[in-house]
């Protein structure tokens, strides 16, 4: 993402340069005078065409008198321009076309009147650290000046050794904005619609945090962070030959071993470890969640849980294939009749089973299925057909059907889900070592691109649950930041939940007390759990046009005003609003350049199309240079 800072000059900077050309410092030249009614939270002033500041520029009213306890102090009151209106007395909204033409042709118009509205930001207390809200209104006739850079730095800058440098003020590229890391103690939300630059922004925050010594774990479903070890600009250079980022040796990468389906090949990303999960370490309910078994399919889930219990009782270290074979043996059907598709291939077994077995209609379907399955099974036995696995003892249920037949039908239904798991390449005899992830000043990227949603939710649940247990036991020696990319898929709002929802909400509400902090990244805040989003006391918000998403962040944050929401659709790529505990006052920032290579950039369609066209042109050129093949004429034989 091009931040544009090297070649873009904002209107605010041009205004300051114009004032400086007069020979006077910009802050000594009055750009307007307060007029009309003012309040402690805002005022209006008139200005001229030459001096009017752009919208969102900062202005100052010097010499304001404020009451502090029993004393009165003189302060410099900072304000931000929120709106500008222009009108001409002889060209008001009542004039028609002919009247306007007459006025302009006879040059009887007056100079435009520029009226500027400003919202009060506050003033610095005597410690030069605390921002106080104004208690008095600015008096009409008071001079208004452009805020000097030095004053703005006191509001927005911090010590470079203990802060996160984010970028510069949107209208002042000479004023850096630094974030207070303590603002992350109550979690951070990074929110932006697709294409606004949220992954670039998140990468900027992460590399700054790593430099401060943080332990960070990133759940990366789109391979946005897999190239952080390389310097920006070397995205297309193989890792072996690329320039390295300053802390590349403190960044490690785990990848799902999916050949041919990775967004970036290994030679671009550099050394990585396999992201693996020990299948037999999952309990039955976890296996059902990863396999996508509906939560209300109680009998199917029970069949899987019981199968796992039997295998563990026999001390079997099983994988999905072994579990599927066990279910097939238990239900008396060949395993090959179930290939993991939505429907069974076995003609002699129940072809489809509804997962919602709790309602009356589904129960009736189940009984009919059991009757059919029982008949088929008995017929097979009478014929002497082979079937793998022992024949379970039969017991009579309340409706006359065998209880074991019910279990057999559920086991057959479970096979459709368990066979799918065999296609996942993440299963192994061991799970990644959590201790290797929790080292100080370590950034771990779990590249889950290509993995199913169930695997992602399980990974989030496994990671946060283990972290949480260590945190509660006092075993975390350093703070840990967990980045949840595409968070709306892991902790959705409304009635929808995932396996990770409960632990994410728990960490969101209690994690700050135990050193576990969330960085929630999403482009759909309206689809994320309010319990999680409302706990993020700091927000970095980029361009956002969807009304539902705007309302969601307004519900979740006390400091999001309607005027700020109105500004969000007009933000350019790389511009962000900083809210909450990260800064002393809200700031509108142009994100600065980052060090690490970017993985989340959009595909350059022009380059791809040119490459495709060149391939075709090369093929055409090669075909023209190849001499035509001479084919001998076919001698026609006379008809006999």
Spans of model-derived segments:
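Short hydrophobic/aromatic beta-strand immediately N-terminal to the Walker A/P-loop
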Residues: 188-189, 217, 445-447
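Conserved ATP-driven motor cores of ASCE-family P-loop NTPases powering translocation/secretion/packaging/pilus
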Residues: 499, 506-590
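Loop/turn-to-beta-strand initiation segments
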Residues: 213-217, 440-443, 477-481, 513-519
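P-loop NTPase motor domains
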Residues: 208, 223, 227, 233-234, ...
